[in-house]
Amino acid sequence: MGFYMLLTVALLLTSLMNVEATPVNQAERSALEKSGLGNRIQPRYDNCGDAEADCYQSKCMDEETYDEECEASCNYVVANCI
């Protein structure tokens, strides 16, 4: 049993030593912060009708014109209306 504990600790330590940090310049970091999932401002809907109207409009049905507004309204429909 002691051998397996020692082996586990050794493997954990070697895996931690092999982790490499990748540098990120400030422009990339601020772009990542602005586009992060937690920072999105989602529109507020009082009912499902407005969200469904936004989600099912023609611009949201086309892959090339699908944007964050479409994603927010469609996510609202999936989470609250279906």
UniProtKB/Swiss-Prot annotation:
Signal peptide segment: 1-21
Main location: secreted
Tissue: Expressed by the venom duct.
Keyword Secreted in annotation: yes
A GO molecular-function descriptor: toxin activity
Keywords: Disulfide bond, Neurotoxin, Secreted, Signal, Toxin
Disulfide bonds: 48-70, 55-74, 60-81
Residue numbers covered by the propeptide annotation in the UniProt entry: 22-39
Cellular compartment(s): Secreted
Membrane-traversing stretches: none
One cellular-component annotation, GO: extracellular region
Secreted is among the record's keywords: yes
Entry domain remark: The cysteine framework is IX (C-C-C-C-C-C).
Protein name per the record: Turripeptide IX-07
Species name: Gemmula speciosa (Splendid gem-turris)
UniProt lineage: Eukaryota, Metazoa, Spiralia, Lophotrochozoa, Mollusca
